[in-house]
Amino acid sequence: MPEGGLIVAVDGPSGAGKSTVCRRIASMLGAKYLDTGAMYRVATLHVLRQGINPSDTTAVVQATRELPLSVNDDPASREVILDGEDVSNEIRGRLVTQNVSAVAAILEVRENLVALQRELAATAHRCVVDGRDIGSTVLVDAPVKIFLTASAEVRAQRRYDQDVAAGRLTDLATVLADVKRRDELDSNRSVSPLAPASDATVVDTSTLTLDQVVDTLMTLIEKSAERTAR
């Protein structure tokens, strides 16, 4: 297992399994875990709670400039704090899911959150960071860059199962439509579009179990550590 400082950047679309896999890997590595997607979801929830239309760029930027967000980087914790309240379940709801791409596409919002993400990763020493532009924009010098993906149908089924387990009312067709819509928005936005970094390893998780994905990523991490040690 790699020793010393380590940054692992894991990107990919919604439902690719990033959060589950990264939590497991961070625990195995004794590292911190940073879910940057949750940060954008918190920003979106904050905007919606203020009654702001996500298309009102000026109002969104002003509302998120000093976001009352507290980040828990313990991989065993799913707690996400907005203004003193755990919103870990609410940020996964359909309303936030429908609007997060619009908020995340705003340049000033991304600049503010990217600065925070870089600061948190730098101070963590050992950190597994997941998102959509970590390897390509946020942490371009990360020694390990991985892009997790899967078919839209598989990702929708995973997200649907998560919603059902969390007691959120939905149906598979609606979730699939949301997944495809978000793929389109995230891939075509002008600021940090969703795409693998040029030096990232792409891993398709469509037919892999969680353990198989974890094993694949741990192998990539160990190989990177071996190359660095030479």
From Swiss-Prot:
Residues spanning the signal sequence: none
Molecular functions (GO terms): ATP binding; CMP kinase activity; dCMP kinase activity
Annotated compartments: Cytoplasm
Domain of life: Bacteria
Assigned EC number: 2.7.4.25
Example GO BP: nucleobase-containing small molecule interconversion
Keyword Cytoplasm annotated: yes
Binding positions for ATP per the UniProt entry: G12, P13, S14, G15, A16, G17, K18, S19, T20
Any single Pfam family the record assigns to this protein: Cytidylate_kin
Class of this enzyme: transferase
Substrates-to-products reaction catalysed: CMP + ATP = CDP + ADP; dCMP + ATP = dCDP + ADP
Alphabetical UniProt keywords: ATP-binding, Cytoplasm, Kinase, Nucleotide-binding, Transferase
Gene Ontology CC: cytosol
NCBIfam families: cmk
Family: Belongs to the cytidylate kinase family. Type 1 subfamily.
Protein name: Cytidylate kinase
UniProt organism field: Corynebacterium diphtheriae (strain ATCC 700971 / NCTC 13129 / Biotype gravis)
